[in-house]
Structure formats: structure tokens, C-alpha cells
Design a protein with these regions (language model features):
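Glycine-/charge-enriched secondary-structure boundary and capping motifs
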Residues: 9-30, 41, 125-149, 158-161, ...
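N-terminal glycine-rich phosphate/pyrophosphate-binding loops that anchor nucleotide-derived ligands
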Residues: 15-109, 148, 183-188, 193, ...
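A generic local secondary-structure boundary/capping motif
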Residues: 57-59, 67-70, 106-108, 140, ...
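Glycine-rich anion-binding loops of enzyme active sites
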Residues: 72-88, 113-208, 346
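Short, well-ordered amphipathic alpha-helical segments that serve as non-catalytic structural scaffolds
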Residues: 97-107, 138-142, 146, 223-227
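Active-site glycine-rich loop that binds ribose-phosphate moieties when present
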Residues: 166-175, 211-231
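Short, compositionally biased
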Residues: 200-216, 337-340
Length: 358
């Protein structure tokens, strides 16, 4: 009853930003990476497909990685990804910034340098075009910061506003990162706090502050460029970014071993833990829970913490694994640079449950 009630409230809302065009958030399950098709459904679909694969493709969708990699020569590869979704914020300019930051992140997560992007636009016929202009302006500003050239795109009429980008970059063949390979003894670190969807849910029904909402926007519009620049100095076992499948969902892709998650180390966005305590969770978070909860042992009762760990992130941080000595140096350097990185946990030998929250 509570879940259905919240879903109905959250998914038919109109927000107005200060001096900005109106965005209509008529969403089935809310916007951003919260809209992703569930882990189980997507895995079931992809396992039955067998697409043609060129020999130059060294990383494809079969690895559930952040982007595909196409080997150009012995030195360098092309890395490419696309992301798009519906609105989840009240300000069109912010929406463009978030969508672009999120799309570019996949290139950083592979160790690459983004070079150019193509816009993906879905926009209702007859809607105020000033809204679209502001979305595109937001994307332009993020791409300018990332030194990414917007070089074209495609637009169609649609019932709902959607925006994203196809981003292309380059990566040296000996510097490609993947989301696999974390080993026993490695430590996981995440570069951004968790709880974005929870804050958005709470804000949409007036249950969290404007300050918390603004902090969530800041989190989603911070490029992973700066964290990636630091990481390139170190030896890493596994790298990905945390988005729609939540922290546990993306951890699940990084190792075949088990992971102890350090509950006391988890960094929450302001207002997210309180939102979870008030049952203001999202449809995407509940999909993640259903797909993954059988793999998780919680050694103490903390429902709100559970929801944060399953919460879908839009434009989340880089999640990486490294040996302890490397992890300590990376964490120190990131903190000195103002990056709010924190320990997530450590890889241990495989146990009955893949994840243990301690």
C-alpha cells in the first residue's frame, strides 16, 4: 500500500524553477537512472541475444561494462557509450547538465578521455521550445568543462521530455579499465555520496529542504573527470561508475568473490537517510532490492541504510578497487583535492552470501 501510494504521488508532478521554463514530470517511475530496466529483466533479455561482433571490439555488452571499446591500432582504442532519460529535476538547465555529466561519466569509467558527443532529444510537439533550449545550454556548459565537442545529434517528438548523449572518447590500450577483476584483499572506494533518488523523491513531496535538493544537484553535475585524473596515477583492479543499479548492483559486477561493506564508512547525501526512514524510496530502488537482496547479509537492522545501498544513482561516482596501500594513497589525494571519496568495503574469499554489511 505504501509503495503504491508513493509511486502515484511521485510520478505525476509539475515543478516550476525560478525564472525558468516549466518542466512537466509525468513519469511512470520517476526520472534519471531510476528509469533503468531492472537487473534481472535486462540480464534475461541479453543472454538470449547473439549479435555479430567485429574482432576489433575488445569490450562489448556481454561484459556488462560502462562502454564499448573498439581497437583502432596497437596503441589506441575508441571508447563509446550513450545514456538518456526523462527529467527528474525542476530546472531544464540543470536537467541538461545532469544528463550530460551522466553520459560522459562512462568514458571516464573506462579510463578514456571523452572527445565529442551527439545529443539525443525527445520532446513533446507543441511544448515551449525555450525548455529545450535551456536543456541544450546546460549540456553545452558541462561539455565545455569536459572539453567535449557537441557535434550533432537526433531529435524526435515524444510524449515526454527525454535527453541524453552518445559520447565518444579515446583510450590507450594499456590503460583500459573494466568493471571486472577485484580480488581478495582489494578495497573498494566510491568518489561521490549516495542517496540521489531518495533526495529527489523526498523533495518532490516537500519532505526535504531546498538545501538538500541543491546539494543533490551539485552531486549529479560534478564531472568524474577530476577523480579519474587522480586514479590514472595508480594501479587499479576494477573501475565502474555507480548509476541505476545502485551501489550493491554495481559492486556485484566487479568481483566473483564476496565483499564486506563498511556501514560506518558510507557517505550519504544530506536528507537521503531521512527520506529512506520515511519510506520515500523509489520504484528503481525496489527493483534493485528484489534483484539483489538474496545476495546480501545485513548483520544488523537498519532499513534506511539498506535503502541507500539499493538506491539508484543518477550521475554517480566512480567505484574502484585497489590494494590497501594504493587505496590509502588514493583516498588521501582525493580528500586533499576536495573529492568526497570514502571506503565502501573490502573483498574477501567467497562466502555463502556475496555481500555482508558490517
Amino acid at each position: 500500500m505504501i509503495k503504491e501510494y508513493m509511486k502515484n504521488i511521485l510520478c505525476d508532478i509539475i515543478f516550476k524553477g525560478d525564472n525558468m521554463p516549466e518542466i512537466n514530470l509525468e513519469l511512470e517511475v520517476c526520472g534519471g537512472c531510476n528509469e533503468k530496466i531492472g537487473i534481472k529483466d535486462l540480464s534475461s533479455l541479453l543472454k538470449d541475444l547473439n549479435p555479430y561482433k567485429r574482432k576489433e571490439i575488445t569490450v562489448g555488452f556481454d561484459g556488462k561494462d560502462d562502454a564499448c571499446v573498439y581497437k583502432i591500432n596497437e596503441d589506441i582504442s575508441l571508447v563509446e557509450s550513450l545514456d538518456f532519460f526523462s527529467t527528474m529535476v525542476k530546472n531544464p538547465y540543470d536537467f541538461g547538465r545532469i544528463a550530460s555529466t551522466n553520459a560522459i561519466s562512462d568514458i571516464y569509467a573506462m579510463g578514456g578521455e571523452p572527445k565529442f558527443a551527439l545529443n539525443i532529444v525527445c520532446f513533446p510537439e507543441g511544448e515551449n521550445l525555450e525548455i529545450l533550449k535551456e536543456i541544450l545550454r546546460g549540456a553545452e556548459d558541462i561539455c565545455r568543462e569536459a572539453e567535449v565537442s557537441i557535434s550533432g545529434g537526433h531529435s524526435i517528438h515524444d510524449r515526454k521530455i527525454k535527453f541524453g548523449q552518445c559520447v565518444t572518447g579515446l583510450v590507450k590500450n594499456n590503460e583500459i579499465w573494466t568493471n571486472k577483476g577485484a580480488e581478495v584483499g582489494d578495497y573498494f572506494i566510491l568518489t561521490k555520496p549516495l542517496g540521489v533518488s531518495l533526495v529527489m523523491s523526498a523533495y518532490s513531496v516537500g519532505e526535504t529542504s531546498e538545501e538538500n535538493y541543491i546539494e543533490a544537484i551539485k552531486n549529479m553535475t560534478t564531472l568524474n573527470k577530476y577523480a579519474a585524473e587522480i586514479l590514472k596515477k595508480y594501479k587499479l583492479s576494477s573501475v565502474t561508475d555507480v548509476t541505476g543499479f545502485g551501489l550493491i548492483g554495481h559492486l556485484d559486477e566487479c568481483t566473483e568473490e564476496s565483499v564486506e561493506i563498511f556501514a560506518d564508512e558510507i557517505n550519504f547525501l544530506p536528507g537521503s537517510y531521512e527520506a529512506a526512514s520515511d519510506f520515500l524510496f523509489t520504484a528503481g530502488g525496489e527493483r534493485n532490492r528484489k534483484a539483489l537482496e538474496d545476495k546480501v547479509e545485513f548483520t544488523f537492522n537498519d532499513f534506511a541504510l539498506e535503502e541507500v545501498l539499493f538506491d539508484p544513482q543518477t550521475s554517480g561516482g566512480l567505484l574502484f578497487a585497489a590494494k590497501k596501500d594504493q587505496a590509502e594513497k588514493i583516498l588521501d589525494e582525493m580528500k586533499e583535492s576536495g573529492i568526497p571519496a570514502f571506503y565502501v568495503g573490502r573483498v574477501i574469499s567467497r562466502e555463502n552470501k556475496k555481500f555482508k554489511v558490517i
